[in-house]
């Protein structure tokens, strides 16, 4: 007879409740554990480690496999072993990183998080996530460790490139779109991370304590998570490593139960960041043993420990059996895990699709190229771009220029795969084996003047083998402009102060009509990288070797274009002075070379906008556009001038900045009404016209400023935006609908409040390039449910 949990016509919740009631303690405990698939290659079978079944499988080892069929084969083998180990045949969830695509080289690659944010295109983000879900589930992967919802205001932090930048509204819009695209049709479950305040770590140091007030934690850092929970029906959340106010999220009831589940209404699955539960004992000394750390985490509401069995161990299981730890804690965790499995359809379809070799379609590649192209930001241009037909000879200089590897950043398949070449990796929660054969053969020589290990000479051949259709920037330029001669010299590396290549590079620059210099560091996961997870920096400028070269190049009086690759924005006085144009390329993925070539040659028009404020110097940090009144670069009192004694308060480039090859004109911002009830919706509109002779895309940005409030409020806040495609001379109408609940803030009693009073609405091409303003009055007060307030204003283009 069919049991209720076997009936697919019932809801996931009903099926999970029925199955839970049939499971014994051993079976239930297996569901909160994770098996690391790499152990299957080390003689540690899943049947031995998890004889009663297992909740999740870490499939990061799939990155080392060359094709989708091999990944699917591994998952099929493990899934069969897991399902055969228990009498209820419960399938496991297989998880992998998906920030820039499914983290295998057989899947489509996309730009890093900052690049995605720079498109300001939630609709495109949803399409990207749907592509990831289709490719991942075809291989048998059902849990995606993305998107990254951390708000980052510190470019010293090596993981900035994973984020959507500094603004909670932009992050909410982009991340919620990602969640919707990924979870559509229940192909995969999204896991948003890192809850909470992770990249507010002191000193820009990975896993360092985050000093954030309870108010800011909720208004800023929790907002993207709340939007995804409310509007995206988010399936899972991963904790932050960073301690907040003396509490570590992995073992904090206040953070996981009271805030996440209580205040924010999250009812999905919580999973630990790698090794975070055992670190409650080993690093933070909050527990007396691994099992005690497991108890703290389970009591706090941590459902599953990743990536392997450590604190959710046999000792903890026996403590539950004896009643020392309440079994009800285990039951509630397992109920959520089973519900997610039923929602994913794993009981009906536990295995990969057959014949997954051709999952990357031409449409997937075209989408990747389009996102890469629209992620790039023209920061500066005095007219040298696009390249004129009169430019016949171009000198191309820099390590990145002829490197396919340079197109990829952290949390990409290639960044993980290059760790097989023997440079110590930096991924948190993963033990690096210094005695491994790869490490023994590693090249440990560093770039002169730095502690960065020289790139293994095998990396670039590996990159070209993994992505045979990818072009370096130089290769793509030669294809895009066949009648232009492109001369190449490396000139300088990506770290240190080496100058031995200067002479050859300066010689080709002398002979050229224009010079393109690639700038920046090496974004990835190991000791040969300059930014990435666990790879933080004191300085935010270019490496000395690049700064000095630009100074020497300046004496030639040649037009110079700088193209910057990195996981944080370019910040250089020298580059600003020497370069006639600067293109921020981030880490654009496999299609990045072609995207850059299209932009430089004018076959495409840049439309990316900064998702972060760019500091002039690390001494300014934190510098961000939505700072509180009378703070940062909007000081109005307490200082004789709005500047440091040795520099300006103002940023190098402002949030939302980005140039185009055409010009856009904005007409008057008009409001339907100038008085709105506190529970009402403000409606407004304006016309935007392409006043140039080239088709382009403008990102129209809406900001608000509370003229007078009971709490200190930001000088301005992004509330919505619209991406407008315009032909030369074309005009379109942008309509805004702004629910007043989006203007709610926490009052003195920590209640969400929409407060009566005057508010200024602004529209502009950036946070500083404001093109129109209008004032309105909020009539009365309202106290909306914080879970159900508006997060991003609706815009329509007519």
List each language-model region with its residue ranges:
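Glycoside hydrolase catalytic-domain context in secreted enzymes
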Residues: 1-747, 756-763, 767-768, 784, ...
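Short beta-strand elements
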Residues: 769-785
């Amino acid at each position: 007879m069919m049991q209720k949990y076997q009936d697919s016509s019932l809801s996931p919740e009903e099926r999970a409740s029925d199955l839970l009631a049939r499971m014994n303690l051993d079976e239930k405990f297996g569901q909160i554990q994770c098996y690391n698939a790499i152990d299957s290659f080390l003689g540690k079978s899943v049947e031995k480690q998890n004889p009663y079944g297992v909740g999740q499988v870490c499939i990061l080892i799939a990155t080392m496999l060359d094709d989708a069929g091999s990944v699917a084969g591994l998952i099929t083998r493990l899934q069969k072993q897991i399902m055969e180990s228990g009498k209820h045949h419960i399938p496991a969830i297989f998880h992998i990183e998906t920030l820039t695509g499914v983290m295998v080289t057989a899947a489509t690659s996309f730009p890093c998080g900052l690049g995605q944010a720079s498109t300001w295109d939630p609709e495109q983000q949803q399409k990207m996530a749907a592509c990831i879900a289709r490719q991942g589930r075809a291989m048998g992967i059902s849990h995606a460790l993305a998107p990254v919802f951390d708000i980052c205001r510190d470019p010293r932090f090596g993981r900035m490139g994973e984020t959507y930048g500094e603004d909670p509204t932009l992050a909410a819009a982009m991340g919620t779109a990602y969640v919707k695209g990924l979870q559509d049709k229940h192909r995969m479950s999204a896991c948003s991370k890192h809850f909470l305040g992770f990249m507010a770590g002191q000193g820009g140091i990975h896993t360092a304590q985050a000093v954030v007030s309870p108010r800011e934690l909720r208004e800023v850092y929790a907002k993207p998570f709340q939007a995804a929970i409310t509007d995206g029906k988010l399936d899972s959340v991963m904790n932050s490593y960073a301690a907040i106010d003396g509490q570590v999220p992995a073992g904090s009831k206040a953070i996981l139960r009271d805030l996440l589940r209580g205040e924010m209404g999250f009812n999905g699955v919580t999973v630990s960041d790698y090794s975070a539960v055992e670190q409650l004992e080993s690093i933070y000394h909050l527990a007396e043993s691994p099992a005690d750390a497991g108890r703290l985490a389970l009591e706090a509401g941590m459902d599953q420990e990743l990536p392997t069995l450590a604190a959710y161990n046999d000792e903890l299981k026996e403590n539950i059996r004896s009643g020392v730890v309440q079994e009800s804690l285990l039951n509630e965790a397992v109920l959520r895990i089973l519900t997610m499995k039923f929602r994913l359809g794993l009981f009906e379809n536990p295995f990969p699709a057959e014949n997954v070799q051709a999952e990357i379609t031409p449409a997937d590649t075209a989408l990747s190229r389009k996102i890469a192209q629209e992620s790039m930001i023209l920061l500066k241009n005095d007219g040298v771009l696009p390249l004129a037909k009169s430019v016949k000879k171009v000198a191309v200089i820099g390590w990145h220029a002829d490197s396919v590897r340079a197109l990829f950043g952290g949390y990409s398949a290639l960044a993980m795969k290059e760790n097989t070449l023997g440079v110590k990796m930096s991924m948190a929660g993963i033990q690096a084996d210094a005695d491994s054969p790869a490490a023994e053969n590693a090249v440990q020589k560093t770039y002169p003047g730095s502690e960065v290990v020289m790139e293994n000479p095998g990396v670039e051949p590996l990159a070209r083998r993994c992505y045979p259709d990818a072009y370096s920037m130089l290769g793509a330029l030669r294809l895009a402009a066949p009648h232009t001669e492109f001369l190449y010299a490396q000139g300088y590396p990506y770290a240190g102060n080496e100058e031995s290549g200067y002479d050859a590079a300066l010689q080709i620059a002398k002979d050229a009509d224009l010079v393109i210099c690639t700038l920046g560091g090496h974004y990835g996961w190991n000791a040969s990288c300059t930014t990435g997870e666990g790879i933080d920096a004191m300085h935010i400028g270019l490496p000395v070797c690049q700064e000095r070269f630009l100074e020497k190049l300046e004496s030639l009086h040649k037009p110079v274009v700088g193209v910057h690759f990195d996981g944080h924005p370019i910040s250089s006085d020298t580059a600003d002075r020497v370069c006639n144009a600067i293109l921020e390329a981030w880490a654009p993925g496999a299609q990045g070379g072609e995207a850059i070539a299209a932009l430089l040659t004018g076959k495409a028009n840049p439309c990316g906008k900064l998702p972060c404020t760019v500091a002039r110097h690390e001494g300014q940090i934190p510098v961000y556009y939505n700072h509180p009144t009378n703070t940062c670069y909007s000081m109005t009192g307490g200082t004789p001038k709005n500047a440091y004694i040795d520099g300006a308060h103002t940023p190098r480039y402002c949030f939302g900045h980005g140039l185009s090859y055409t010009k856009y004109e904005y007409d008057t911002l008009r409001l339907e009404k100038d008085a709105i009830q506190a529970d009402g919706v403000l409606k407004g509109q304006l016309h935007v016209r392409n006043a140039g002779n080239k088709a382009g895309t403008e990102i129209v940005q809406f900001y608000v400023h509370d003229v007078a409030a009971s709490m200190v409020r930001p000088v301005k806040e992004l509330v919505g935006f619209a991406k407008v495609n315009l032909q030369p001379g074309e005009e379109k109408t942008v309509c805004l609908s702004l629910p007043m609940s989006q203007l709610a803030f926490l009052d003195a009693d920590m209640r969400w409040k929409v407060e009566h009073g005057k508010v200024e609405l602004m529209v502009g091409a950036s946070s500083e390039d404001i093109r129109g303003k209008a004032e309105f009055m909020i009539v009365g007060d309202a106290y909306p449910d914080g879970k159900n307030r508006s997060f991003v204003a609706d815009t329509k283009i007519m």
